[in-house]
């Protein structure tokens, strides 16, 4: 037995379906199927942990407010105390292209609400939630705040954001660098051909807009791939590539696909099997009337088969010159990557 059989004979997902949410830059549902039994839970849990903890992002690390010495202060003419303002600052979502740290400033006079959209940013820093309210100024009040922004991963507590040489009045802020806000997953049964006990993994991802859910998942998978490489203690033998000569066919290569590979109901599949219909080429030559004469084959099964064939650009009652070929089994193997 070759070692490659350990992974080559496992079924792998043949598609990743992405369904965008109301805001495609922030919300999406991603479905991978089919997976070997148990792999849905294994991959779902691992990807969720990496998505929430390991992706790079940007966040506010500290703030300096003019006239404020510490976070337990209050500011004349500002309705919120400094503690509440700092809590609001934690929720600022930022996208930063270059390397940090960077400085951002707010300077505003009352009356009115101070929002994240009032921040004066540098060129490669973007505030993603400008509607976020930071504080409220009364008539005649004024506030000036200077933020330090940097990149990182995961969650960093405020005490770790305080430099050793921090000046008086610098207030460190808890930093949530991760661009991913929420991740949930579920595992369901799915079918492949006539086998019903494969896994379907569904991931629902919400980001802050700095990265799309699809890219976040791709980066997380790459992180896992990189971390697992250390456990592979062998090199695979290189397979010599031989250029195969593919013969010309007088018919569509899709006709060489077996009907048991179609996603049909058990009833429809059994009816085809009992009527000795093995390949799609056998099936498309049948008329609707011939199919309805098959024992236990009704209108519901007929409509199901017509729908599956239509998705392939085929239909019942087709003429297939040269069918069946003498070497049909050999041709089916040679053309399995062409339909």
Swiss-Prot record:
Residues 251-339 are annotated as: Alpha C-terminal domain (alpha-CTD). Residues 1-235 are annotated as: Alpha N-terminal domain (alpha-NTD). InterPro entries: DNA-dir_RNA_pol_insert, DNA-dir_RNA_pol_RpoA/D/Rpb3, DNA-dir_RpoA, RBP11-like, RNAP_asu_C, RNApol_insert_sf. SUPFAM superfamilies: C-terminal domain of RNA polymerase alpha subunit, Insert subdomain of RNA polymerase alpha subunit, RBP11-like subunits of RNA polymerase. It is an enzyme of class 2 (transferase). One of its GO terms (biological process) is DNA-templated transcription. GO terms for molecular function: DNA binding; DNA-directed RNA polymerase activity; protein dimerization activity. It catalyses: RNA(n) + a ribonucleoside 5'-triphosphate = RNA(n+1) + diphosphate. Keywords: DNA-directed RNA polymerase, Nucleotidyltransferase, Transcription, Transferase. Its EC number is 2.7.7.6. Pfam families: RNA_pol_A_bac, RNA_pol_A_CTD, RNA_pol_L. GO terms for cellular component: cytoplasm; DNA-directed RNA polymerase complex. DNA-dependent RNA polymerase catalyzes the transcription of DNA into RNA using the four ribonucleoside triphosphates as substrates. Belongs to the RNA polymerase alpha chain family. Homodimer. The RNAP catalytic core consists of 2 alpha, 1 beta, 1 beta' and 1 omega subunit. When a sigma factor is associated with the core the holoenzyme is formed, which can initiate transcription. The N-terminal domain is essential for RNAP assembly and basal transcription, whereas the C-terminal domain is involved in interaction with transcriptional regulators and with upstream promoter elements. This is DNA-directed RNA polymerase subunit alpha. The gene is rpoA.
């Amino acid at each position: 037995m070759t070692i490659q059989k350990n992974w080559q004979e496992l079924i792998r997902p043949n598609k990743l379906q992405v369904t965008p949410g109301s805001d495609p830059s922030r919300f999406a549902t991603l479905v991978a199927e089919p997976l070997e039994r148990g792999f849905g839970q294994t991959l779902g849990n691992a990807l969720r942990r990496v998505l929430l903890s390991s992706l790079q992002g940007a966040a506010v690390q500290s703030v300096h407010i003019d006239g404020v010495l510490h976070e337990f202060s209050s500011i004349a003419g500002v309705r919120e105390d400094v503690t509440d303002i700092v809590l609001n600052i934690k929720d600022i979502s930022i996208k930063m292209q270059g390397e940090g740290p960077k400085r951002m400033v707010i300077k505003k006079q009352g009356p009115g609400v101070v929002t994240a959209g009032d921040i004066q940013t540098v060129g490669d820093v973007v505030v993603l939630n400008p509607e976020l309210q930071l504080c409220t100024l009364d008539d005649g009040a004024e506030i000036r705040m200077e933020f330090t922004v940097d990149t990182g991963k995961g969650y960093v507590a405020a005490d770790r954001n305080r430099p050793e040489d921090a000046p008086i009045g610098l207030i460190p802020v808890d930093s949530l660098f991760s661009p991913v806000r929420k991740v949930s997953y579920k595992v369901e049964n799915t079918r492949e051909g006539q086998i019903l006990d494969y896994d379907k993994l569904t991931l629902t991802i919400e980001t802050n807009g700095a990265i799309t859910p699809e890219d976040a998942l791709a980066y997380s998978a790459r992180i896992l791939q990189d971390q697992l490489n250390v456990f592979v203690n062998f090199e695979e033998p290189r397979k010599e590539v031989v250029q195969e000569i593919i013969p010309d066919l007088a018919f569509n290569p899709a006709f060489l696909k077996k009907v048991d590979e179609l996603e049909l109901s058990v009833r429809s599949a059994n009816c085809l099997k009992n009527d000795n219909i093995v390949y799609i080429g056998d099936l498309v030559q049948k008329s609707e009337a011939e199919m309805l004469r098959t024992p236990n084959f009704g209108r519901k099964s007929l409509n199901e088969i017509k729908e599956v064939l239509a998705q392939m650009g085929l239909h019942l009652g087709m003429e297939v010159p040269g069918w069946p070929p003498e070497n049909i089994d050999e041709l089916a193997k040679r053309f399995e990557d062409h339909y």
